[in-house]
């Protein structure tokens, strides 16, 4: 499922970082944002010409909040994306996730994975996803790197591959990786109904034209198999 280059805005959640360091992070985020510019709703686009005043303010607010200790990115992102923007289909899918979310021991990522497939993914994509899900539960498994390798090698443009490699490298920088943090936040039944709703909202918006590296990686978690080519890439 293609989607407007999802929010690859890297936030420093831990405290004690210098102001100059925070500014660097914001600049890096803006660089990612520029890569993702395309048609359709795209929260992460902070470019003034592309967003309404309200969207600009919400985006800027999220960037500033990113330096606050204990910042809950997902909750604030929900407020930016959900207000009056969901279609009936999006609402139905979100409702399903909300219902699932009330179950004890709910694994949000797994349910989101199921919702992602739901007639929207090819058999090849579904198989890759299922394998990644299984691998992801193994101790010592480098989930993000494996996922990035599966989706980038020989399949992405030079710019997209560069972004993938950049994300892998960031994993070892100062112990911070926004994408990993977000996945951890989504797992283990700790998300609210609103968080779950947001996830499905983002998934359904994937029908918009444009490439979204983050969503493609998440989509790879949906049901299914890996093609021979993808299996080779993963070895």
UniProtKB/Swiss-Prot annotation:
Prosequence residues removed at maturation: 19-35, 52-65, 87-100, 122-135, 157-170, 192-205, 227-235
Its localization reads: Secreted
Q: Does the keyword Secreted apply?
A: yes
Signal peptide, first to last residue = 1-18
- What are the entry keywords? Amidation, Antibiotic, Antimicrobial, Cleavage on pair of basic residues, Secreted, Signal
Family that this chain belongs to: Belongs to the maximin-S family.
What protein name applies here? Maximins-S type A
Q: Which organism is it from?
A: Bombina maxima (Giant fire-bellied toad)
């Amino acid at each position: 499922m293609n989607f407007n280059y999802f929010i690859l805005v890297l936030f420093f959640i831990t405290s004690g970082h210098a102001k100059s360091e925070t500014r660097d992070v914001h600049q890096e985020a803006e660089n990612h944002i520029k890569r993702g510019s395309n048609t359709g709703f795209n929260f992460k686009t902070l470019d003034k010409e592309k967003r309404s005043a309200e969207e600009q303010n919400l985006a800027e607010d999220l960037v500033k909040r990113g330096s606050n200790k204990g910042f809950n990115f997902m909750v604030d992102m929900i407020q930016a994306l959900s207000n009056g923007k969901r279609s009936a289909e999006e609402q139905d899918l979100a409702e399903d996730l909300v219902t699932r979310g009330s179950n004890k021991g709910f694994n949000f990522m797994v349910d989101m994975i199921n919702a992602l497939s739901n007639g929207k993914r090819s058999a090849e994509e579904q198989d890759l996803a299922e394998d990644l899900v299984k691998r992801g539960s193994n101790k010592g498994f480098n989930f993000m790197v494996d996922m990035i390798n599966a989706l980038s090698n020989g399949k992405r443009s030079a710019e997209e591959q560069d972004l993938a490699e950049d994300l892998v490298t960031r994993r070892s920088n100062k112990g911070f990786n926004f994408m990993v943090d977000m996945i951890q936040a989504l797992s283990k039944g700790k998300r609210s109904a609103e968080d779950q709703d947001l996830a499905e909202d983002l998934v359904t918006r994937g029908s918009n034209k444009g490439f979204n590296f983050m969503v493609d990686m998440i989509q790879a978690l949906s049901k299914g198999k890996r093609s021979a080519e993808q299996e080779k890439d993963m070895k």
